[in-house]
């Protein structure tokens, strides 16, 4: 039995643009988010309050947050890796934040230069500040179906990290297959383990299409009761670990599949495709959305 409705979390402006080589002008980012707001998407991850030294693409985070037209009923979460980022985000008007963890020790070490345990301790500072400010926090767990450095990751480890982030107060845990290596079988096994520790209503999946498995993996998650799915307009965001490989699943393709299954999303597919066309033209690249590629030929 599929869920009757699915909340689509648009991650293109943050996770998508973050991997773009050339810096995207601030007005283009603002226009992208404003167009996405008009599609009916309920959640649009807007930017990341990380140090510009680490991610130059997101250096304009405050300008973006203050420049976008925030529609009622739409949330605009931002990624905040630490307390400093959290404070800057709140100062810029953020009403929801995300923290980014991983189920791989080596990935955590290379990504934020500490152990998983230490990363969770760092998050507790953000969690406490967020609680005091009544700001909801979403937790990402990366490398849930494999790691670019460690290879296989056990479902038990994913469940353990997810449980810790959930019990710290994250209202939703987004399980991310950053390298897109998972298949429906490994997705099913991993979700079964995590669902023993975290209620399915608090889970989301974040699938990359690097190996062409994203929609199949999402379908399995839906069958298991997951009703929140992350996606990126036009499939923006390559894979940082595999040059030229596709990254995030395209929001257009996800919505097309959900429409076909009769699952309600509230998203206008045509407006979404127009937004994909806009950002691809602005970036001078072709879309990674199969639906948009097909529509171009009609």
Curated annotation (Swiss-Prot):
One of its GO terms (cellular component) is peroxisome. It catalyses: (3S)-3-hydroxy-3-methylglutaryl-CoA = acetoacetate + acetyl-CoA. Its EC number is 4.1.3.4. Gene3D superfamilies: Aldolase class I. It comes from Gallus gallus. InterPro entries: Aldolase_TIM (IPR013785), HMG_CoA_lyase_AS (IPR000138), HMGL (IPR043594), PYR_CT (IPR000891). GO terms for molecular function: hydroxymethylglutaryl-CoA lyase activity; metal ion binding. Homodimer; disulfide-linked. Can also form homotetramers. This is Hydroxymethylglutaryl-CoA lyase, mitochondrial. Keywords: Acetylation, Disulfide bond, Lipid metabolism, Lyase, Metal-binding, Mitochondrion, Peroxisome. Residues 6-273 form the Pyruvate carboxyltransferase domain.
